[in-house]
Protein backbone atom coordinates (compact mmCIF):
# COMPACT_ATOMS: atom_id res chain seq x y z
CA UNK A 1 0.00 0.00 0.00
CA UNK A 2 1.42 3.41 -0.88
CA UNK A 3 2.80 5.43 2.03
CA UNK A 4 0.38 8.32 1.42
CA UNK A 5 -2.67 6.11 2.00
CA UNK A 6 -1.85 5.13 5.60
CA UNK A 7 -4.56 5.47 8.18
CA UNK A 8 -4.16 6.37 11.82
CA UNK A 9 -5.48 4.13 14.61
CA UNK A 10 -8.94 5.77 14.42
CA UNK A 11 -9.58 4.27 10.99
CA UNK A 12 -9.59 7.70 9.36
CA UNK A 13 -6.99 8.84 6.83
CA UNK A 14 -3.96 10.41 8.48
CA UNK A 15 -3.99 14.22 8.31
CA UNK A 16 -2.78 15.65 5.02
CA UNK A 17 -2.65 12.26 3.28
CA UNK A 18 -4.12 11.46 -0.14
CA UNK A 19 -6.95 8.94 -0.24
CA UNK A 20 -8.33 7.40 -3.42
CA UNK A 21 -11.87 8.55 -4.08
CA UNK A 22 -13.12 5.26 -5.52
CA UNK A 23 -15.30 2.67 -3.87
CA UNK A 24 -13.63 -0.73 -3.72
CA UNK A 25 -15.22 -3.05 -6.27
CA UNK A 26 -14.38 -6.62 -7.12
CA UNK A 27 -12.66 -7.30 -10.40
CA UNK A 28 -15.69 -9.30 -11.53
CA UNK A 29 -18.00 -6.38 -10.68
CA UNK A 30 -15.84 -4.14 -12.83
CA UNK A 31 -15.96 -6.76 -15.60
CA UNK A 32 -19.75 -6.84 -15.33
CA UNK A 33 -19.99 -3.06 -15.58
CA UNK A 34 -17.68 -3.16 -18.59
CA UNK A 35 -19.79 -5.83 -20.30
CA UNK A 36 -23.00 -3.87 -19.75
CA UNK A 37 -21.35 -0.78 -21.25
CA UNK A 38 -20.02 -2.73 -24.23
CA UNK A 39 -22.78 -5.22 -25.03
CA UNK A 40 -25.87 -3.35 -23.88
CA UNK A 41 -24.87 0.28 -24.49
CA UNK A 42 -22.72 -0.22 -27.59
CA UNK A 43 -19.54 1.33 -26.21
CA UNK A 44 -16.11 0.28 -27.50
CA UNK A 45 -14.32 -2.40 -25.50
CA UNK A 46 -10.91 -0.73 -25.47
CA UNK A 47 -12.31 2.63 -24.36
CA UNK A 48 -14.40 1.05 -21.59
CA UNK A 49 -11.45 -0.95 -20.27
CA UNK A 50 -9.14 2.06 -20.47
CA UNK A 51 -11.64 4.14 -18.49
CA UNK A 52 -12.03 1.47 -15.79
CA UNK A 53 -8.29 0.93 -15.47
CA UNK A 54 -7.73 4.67 -15.13
CA UNK A 55 -10.42 5.03 -12.49
CA UNK A 56 -9.59 1.98 -10.36
CA UNK A 57 -5.97 1.34 -9.31
CA UNK A 58 -5.84 -2.45 -9.69
CA UNK A 59 -2.86 -4.68 -9.08
CA UNK A 60 -1.23 -6.09 -12.23
CA UNK A 61 -2.77 -9.54 -11.68
CA UNK A 62 -6.27 -8.08 -11.35
CA UNK A 63 -5.76 -5.85 -14.40
CA UNK A 64 -4.73 -8.87 -16.47
CA UNK A 65 -7.70 -10.91 -15.19
CA UNK A 66 -10.14 -8.08 -15.96
CA UNK A 67 -8.81 -7.56 -19.46
CA UNK A 68 -8.75 -11.26 -20.34
CA UNK A 69 -12.23 -11.82 -18.92
CA UNK A 70 -13.87 -8.89 -20.70
CA UNK A 71 -12.04 -9.21 -24.02
CA UNK A 72 -12.51 -12.99 -24.10
CA UNK A 73 -16.20 -12.76 -23.25
CA UNK A 74 -16.78 -10.19 -25.99
CA UNK A 75 -14.78 -12.27 -28.48
CA UNK A 76 -16.59 -15.56 -27.73
CA UNK A 77 -20.04 -14.03 -27.13
CA UNK A 78 -21.89 -15.90 -29.91
CA UNK A 79 -20.60 -19.26 -28.70
CA UNK A 80 -21.31 -18.37 -25.06
CA UNK A 81 -24.89 -17.39 -25.91
CA UNK A 82 -25.35 -20.68 -27.77
CA UNK A 83 -24.15 -22.66 -24.74
CA UNK A 84 -26.29 -20.62 -22.32
CA UNK A 85 -29.35 -21.15 -24.53
CA UNK A 86 -28.76 -24.92 -24.41
CA UNK A 87 -28.94 -24.97 -20.60
CA UNK A 88 -31.41 -22.19 -19.81
CA UNK A 89 -35.18 -22.31 -20.07
CA UNK A 90 -35.15 -18.59 -20.83
CA UNK A 91 -33.33 -17.65 -24.06
CA UNK A 92 -30.41 -15.24 -23.75
CA UNK A 93 -32.25 -12.64 -25.83
CA UNK A 94 -35.10 -12.51 -23.28
CA UNK A 95 -32.95 -12.33 -20.15
CA UNK A 96 -32.45 -9.13 -18.20
CA UNK A 97 -29.31 -7.39 -19.49
CA UNK A 98 -27.47 -7.68 -16.17
CA UNK A 99 -28.30 -11.40 -15.85
CA UNK A 100 -27.25 -12.02 -19.44
CA UNK A 101 -23.86 -10.41 -18.82
CA UNK A 102 -23.34 -12.24 -15.51
CA UNK A 103 -23.98 -15.55 -17.28
CA UNK A 104 -21.71 -14.70 -20.20
CA UNK A 105 -18.83 -13.79 -17.87
CA UNK A 106 -19.27 -16.93 -15.78
CA UNK A 107 -19.58 -19.27 -18.77
CA UNK A 108 -16.45 -17.77 -20.30
CA UNK A 109 -14.58 -18.50 -17.05
CA UNK A 110 -15.91 -22.07 -17.00
CA UNK A 111 -15.04 -22.79 -20.62
CA UNK A 112 -11.84 -20.82 -21.18
CA UNK A 113 -10.14 -19.92 -17.89
CA UNK A 114 -8.66 -23.11 -16.49
CA UNK A 115 -7.12 -21.31 -13.50
CA UNK A 116 -10.63 -20.37 -12.27
CA UNK A 117 -12.36 -23.33 -10.60
CA UNK A 118 -15.87 -23.93 -11.94
CA UNK A 119 -17.29 -23.62 -8.44
CA UNK A 120 -15.67 -20.19 -8.04
CA UNK A 121 -17.12 -19.00 -11.36
CA UNK A 122 -20.60 -20.13 -10.24
CA UNK A 123 -20.34 -18.71 -6.72
CA UNK A 124 -18.97 -15.37 -7.88
CA UNK A 125 -21.75 -15.09 -10.48
CA UNK A 126 -24.37 -15.66 -7.77
CA UNK A 127 -22.66 -13.00 -5.62
CA UNK A 128 -22.79 -10.59 -8.58
CA UNK A 129 -26.51 -11.26 -8.93
CA UNK A 130 -27.03 -10.45 -5.25
CA UNK A 131 -24.76 -7.38 -5.32
CA UNK A 132 -26.65 -6.00 -8.32
CA UNK A 133 -30.13 -6.31 -6.80
CA UNK A 134 -31.01 -9.53 -8.63
CA UNK A 135 -31.49 -11.68 -5.52
CA UNK A 136 -34.72 -13.28 -6.86
CA UNK A 137 -32.72 -14.47 -9.90
CA UNK A 138 -29.74 -15.92 -8.05
CA UNK A 139 -31.28 -19.41 -8.18
CA UNK A 140 -31.76 -19.07 -11.94
CA UNK A 141 -28.12 -17.96 -12.39
CA UNK A 142 -26.88 -20.81 -10.19
CA UNK A 143 -29.04 -23.41 -11.97
CA UNK A 144 -27.96 -22.40 -15.46
CA UNK A 145 -24.30 -22.35 -14.49
CA UNK A 146 -24.43 -25.70 -12.68
CA UNK A 147 -25.96 -27.21 -15.84
CA UNK A 148 -23.24 -25.64 -17.97
CA UNK A 149 -20.55 -27.05 -15.66
CA UNK A 150 -22.11 -30.53 -15.83
CA UNK A 151 -22.78 -30.69 -19.55
CA UNK A 152 -20.87 -28.08 -21.60
CA UNK A 153 -18.15 -30.49 -22.73
CA UNK A 154 -20.88 -32.61 -24.36
CA UNK A 155 -22.73 -29.64 -25.88
CA UNK A 156 -23.83 -30.54 -29.41
CA UNK A 157 -22.76 -27.75 -31.73
CA UNK A 158 -24.68 -27.10 -34.96
CA UNK A 159 -23.92 -29.72 -37.61
CA UNK A 160 -21.72 -28.88 -40.58
CA UNK A 161 -24.82 -29.35 -42.79
CA UNK A 162 -25.93 -25.92 -41.62
CA UNK A 163 -22.64 -24.35 -42.71
CA UNK A 164 -23.38 -20.79 -41.67
CA UNK A 165 -24.71 -21.60 -38.19
CA UNK A 166 -21.96 -24.17 -37.62
CA UNK A 167 -19.13 -21.74 -38.40
CA UNK A 168 -20.87 -18.85 -36.64
CA UNK A 169 -21.14 -20.70 -33.33
CA UNK A 170 -17.88 -22.65 -33.57
CA UNK A 171 -15.77 -19.57 -34.33
CA UNK A 172 -18.07 -17.07 -32.62
CA UNK A 173 -18.49 -14.92 -35.72
CA UNK A 174 -21.67 -13.14 -36.82
CA UNK A 175 -23.62 -15.06 -39.45
CA UNK A 176 -23.47 -12.17 -41.93
CA UNK A 177 -19.66 -12.33 -41.93
CA UNK A 178 -19.70 -16.11 -42.32
CA UNK A 179 -22.16 -15.76 -45.22
CA UNK A 180 -19.94 -13.22 -46.93
CA UNK A 181 -16.85 -15.42 -46.52
CA UNK A 182 -18.64 -18.53 -47.79
CA UNK A 183 -19.95 -16.62 -50.82
CA UNK A 184 -16.46 -15.34 -51.57
CA UNK A 185 -14.25 -18.32 -50.65
CA UNK A 186 -16.44 -21.41 -50.20
CA UNK A 187 -16.96 -23.46 -47.03
CA UNK A 188 -13.55 -25.20 -46.72
CA UNK A 189 -11.49 -22.06 -47.25
CA UNK A 190 -13.77 -20.07 -44.92
CA UNK A 191 -13.30 -22.68 -42.21
CA UNK A 192 -9.53 -22.59 -42.75
CA UNK A 193 -9.48 -18.79 -42.44
Q: Which residues are covered by each model-predicted region?
A:
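Class I Rossmann-like S-adenosyl-L-methionine
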Residues: 1-193
